[in-house]
UniProtKB/Swiss-Prot annotation:
Lineage, uppermost ranks: Viruses, Varidnaviria, Bamfordvirae, Nucleocytoviricota, Megaviricetes
Domain FCP1 homology: 1-180
PROSITE patterns: FCP1
Known function: May function as a phosphatase.
Name used for this protein in its record: Putative CTD phosphatase-like protein 355R
Keyword field: Hydrolase, Protein phosphatase
Species per Swiss-Prot/TrEMBL record: Invertebrate iridescent virus 6
InterPro entries named in the record: FCP1_dom, HAD-like_sf, HAD_sf, TIM50
């Protein structure tokens, strides 16, 4: 089975710090269109449209992993609330955080690559990963540029944008992944 790494911020979810809210009415109206969670009155985090069906598809067809530039505590909250709590049978095999992004940038200085998948098999010698079976889904162009053949790009998701509740990006990506699997 192939491996897929998922980015969190602006790929699967969008988080807005409460301290940045200037129009509380609009903020609440926008959030009402989404599955959202309040993280300790610090962040309001909204799941991207079609997140759960997309995750169902991924967990059925891939070994699922996370690679995020977020801190461990923040990422753990998102993983628990948006991924695992919705379906306790889901299993995430490996989670990489901000620390791993810093290591990647240090190792791949010339490319400034914060999530270089190659590290898994060349530096860390993890035998279940290789360039033929390991991919990442991310919204950052830098991630795509550093591994063109192993990255599936998505448009960044921002729930405060008008019409963001109609976002179809995860369903589009599901079709792309389906073609890639076959």
């Amino acid at each position: 089975m192939k491996n897929i790494f998922l980015d969190l911020d602006n790929t699967l979810i969008c988080a807005e710090p409460f301290e940045d809210i200037t129009d509380l009415g609009r903020f609440k109206e926008r959030a009402s269109h989404f599955d959202f969670k309040n993280m300790e009155d610090y962040y309001l985090i909204c799941g991207r449209p079609y997140l759960q069906p997309f995750l169902d598809y991924l967990f059925k067809n891939f070994n699922v992993h996370i690679w995020t530039a977020a801190s461990k505590g923040y990422a753990s909250f998102i993983i628990e609330e948006f991924i695992l709590k919705k379906d306790p049978s889901r299993k995430i095999n490996l989670v990489l955080f901000d620390h791993h992004c810093r290591v990647s940038k240090r190792v791949y200085k010339k490319e400034k690559a914060s999530k270089k998948l190659e590290m898994l098999w060349t530096i860390w010698k993890l035998q279940e990963f290789d360039k033929e079976n390991t991919f990442i889904i991310d919204d950052l162009e830098e991630v795509k540029e550093s591994q063109v053949k192993n990255c599936f790009s998505v448009k960044p998701f921002f729930f405060m944008e008008n019409d963001s509740e109609y976002d179809q990006e995860l369903m589009r990506l599901k079709d792309v992944l389906n073609r890639h699997l076959n």
